[in-house]
């Protein structure tokens, strides 16, 4: 590969990303993963720390129906604030799923996990017996 696209949240956070980057022999580019402003803070921090001029798609949180903060981090003229945002109780309550939606998404995740080979699950540290089915 010519470059590695790094998405902080799916890779396990800043510490995990740092360990991964150390092992790479190609330049990295940071990209978002549909994060709220709370999660975006970690991606922004990591991008600024490891590859400040190599970012793309960090504003995908704008695509979410709601954010976990009252004042979301949004880009302005191609720039984005590094200011940390903490989740707010009212915003989290507004974003919470009904029990029916929780059950729907849990079932979707379980169905998807059933398609993942057990050797891959093992490499993620997921015991085979913990997967439904």
Where are each of the predicted segments found?
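Short, well-ordered coil/turn segments that N-cap beta-strands
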Residues: 2, 26, 52-54
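Short low-complexity, flexible loop/linker segments enriched in glycine and/or proline
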Residues: 1, 20-21, 44-46
């Amino acid at each position: 590969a010519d470059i590695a696209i790094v998405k902080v949240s799916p890779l396990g956070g800043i510490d995990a990303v740092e360990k991964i980057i150390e092992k790479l022999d190609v330049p990295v580019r940071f990209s978002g993963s549909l994060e709220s402003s709370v999660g975006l803070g970690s991606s922004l921090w990591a991008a600024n720390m490891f590859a400040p001029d190599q970012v793309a798609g960090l504003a995908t949180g704008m695509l979410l129906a709601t954010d976990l903060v009252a004042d979301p981090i949004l880009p302005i003229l191609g720039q984005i604030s590094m200011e940390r945002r903490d989740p707010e109780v009212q915003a989290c309550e507004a974003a919470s799923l009904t029990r029916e939606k929780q059950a729907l998404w849990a079932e979707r995740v379980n169905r998807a996990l059933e398609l993942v080979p057990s050797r891959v699950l093992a490499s993620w540290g997921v015991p085979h017996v913990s997967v439904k089915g």
